[in-house]
Amino acid sequence: MARFPKINLDITHRCTLQCRRCNRAIFAARGQKVPGEDMTIENFKKILDFFEEITFCGQISDPIFHPKFIDFLKLCKDKKVTIHTAASHKKEDWYKKAFEANTNAYWTFGIDGLPKDSHKYRINQDGEHLFKMACMASKIVKKVKWQYIVFNYNENNIEEARQMAKDNNLVFEVQKSSRFWEDDPLMPKNKEYYIERKNYENPTKV
C-alpha cells in the first residue's frame, strides 16, 4: 500500500515552448543550461510504491517529451494520474496512443486564449493543433481540462472560449497569474484577472 497521498513529478528537462514567464526563460536570459534529466523507468517504479496520486506537471519541462512517457502512463493505470501539458510538437497518432495508454487519466491543456492566439504567450505553440488534441482526449480519457491563463490579448475572449470548451466536453478553468511586473506588456487591463505582487521585477533581466 502507498504511504503518501500524492506527488508532482518533473520527469524531464525538455520543452519546445518559450513561454516568457516560465523558469526556462530565466535560465535562457542568464545563458544557463536548463537543469535536469530524464527520469528512468526504474526510479519511476520506485515512486509508484509510495504514492497514490501522480501528477506530471513540469516546472521547467513538458512531460510529453520524456521518451518513455507513454510507458509511464501504462505503469500507473491503478493510480490517479493527472497530466499538465502545453506543448504541441507531437503528431496526432502519438496523442492517441498516449490517451489510450491510460484512459483513467486526467489531462489539462494549457491554451491561453482562443486556440489561434495562444502562441502570443506560449511561443512556438500550435494552439489550434493542441485544441484538436484536447477534443480528441475528451472522447477517450476520464476528464479533460482547458486551462486558460488571462493576459491582455485574451481577456476579452473568455466567454467565447468557455463556450468552445462546453461544446467539446472540456472543463474550462480561468487562471489568474501573479507573474506580472509594473508596466508588463502582457498584464490584463482588468485588475480582476491577475494577482498583484508588490515590488515584483522582471526576473529575466540580467
Regions found by a protein language model. Give the residues of each.
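Conserved alpha-helical substructure of the radical SAM core
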Residues: 1-106, 120-128, 132, 168, ...
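Glycine-centered loop/turn positions within well-structured domains
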Residues: 17, 116, 144
